[in-house]
């Protein structure tokens, strides 16, 4: 097993401020950049006071967005990272099969999890990855293969909080909304995408936790939100954490016996106070997860929305709603609340929100690129029919 050496890294990685920050620093997503550039140029040149010109820009933007999903990419894949479901002997055996077949191919280096290094022979073509490596040097990997269920895909999303290499998920778990590649045909599937790849950019949310500094000080939260929409630390609040989620962020009452009071703001405008066991804010990808159980609707991943679903709401008039993902949501725990609430990010990293604290949710500039067949729509609908067992007698 060869240990990773920093000297192997590219000497000119992408900076945070570069527009390419939305794409991994690799040849795969660089080929999508011209389409995005065209969209940005049209947006800047369009005279917004002319309705017809604005209509044309909107139409062309939709056309370019569609091209991103159906544009074939000619990848140059030399480095593949494997993420597998832990504690499963069947998955472990299949992982070994994957690794030894991949390193038999020309110019392919495979990265496996460091905890599994004793399972493989030492060779320069097998290296191992750590969480820190994935976080700091995501541009090193040209492709990620996941072996497991949807939980393994979510774990991969947590590994890459910023730029994400293309993800190719193989189904070896209990749920399969995201894992539409058949593990029995892995050789054919991998060889096909090495020649031509289609990538779908799934929306992720950036979630920022803001903690109130002085618990005894009463502040005007409406005024505060309108003045600090993009701020980190403010006079009254401290920024404590930022996480990117693929499925959803959930605010719930935790161990408390009473319902939570949750104030909901849309772009700093007060919408309503939710009296419920909690609130689920989901991406279109997450519409098949907790959001579905909370009464939210299924949503195709191409639709640009934030799905807000109350969990066991006290009022029958409080129903799930869809909000454009161009907006920012603020979830505020009232300053006079009698109890705290808890938040979780894709089911992990539970954090307590005390009265006066709030959470900001907005679309992340780092999407989650999944490899798919030529017809992404068919992939999604087939996964829905298969997993929800529709049309089965």
Curated annotation (Swiss-Prot):
Its main location: cytoplasm. This is Uncharacterized kinase C3H5.11. PANTHER family: KINASE, PUTATIVE (AFU_ORTHOLOGUE AFUA_5G12870)-RELATED (PTHR20275:SF11), NAD KINASE (PTHR20275). One of its GO terms (cellular component) is cytosol. Belongs to the NAD kinase family. GO terms for molecular function: NAD+ kinase activity; NADH kinase activity. It comes from Schizosaccharomyces pombe (strain 972 / ATCC 24843). Gene3D superfamilies: Probable inorganic polyphosphate/atp-NAD kinase, domain 1, Probable inorganic polyphosphate/atp-NAD kinase, domain 2. GO terms for biological process: NAD metabolic process; NADP biosynthetic process. Keywords: Cytoplasm, Kinase, NAD, NADP, Nucleus, Transferase. Its EC number is 2.7.1.-. It is found in: Cytoplasm; Nucleus. InterPro entries: ATP-NAD_kinase_N (IPR017438), ATP-NAD_kinase_PpnK-typ_C (IPR017437), NAD/diacylglycerol_kinase_sf (IPR016064), NADK (IPR002504).
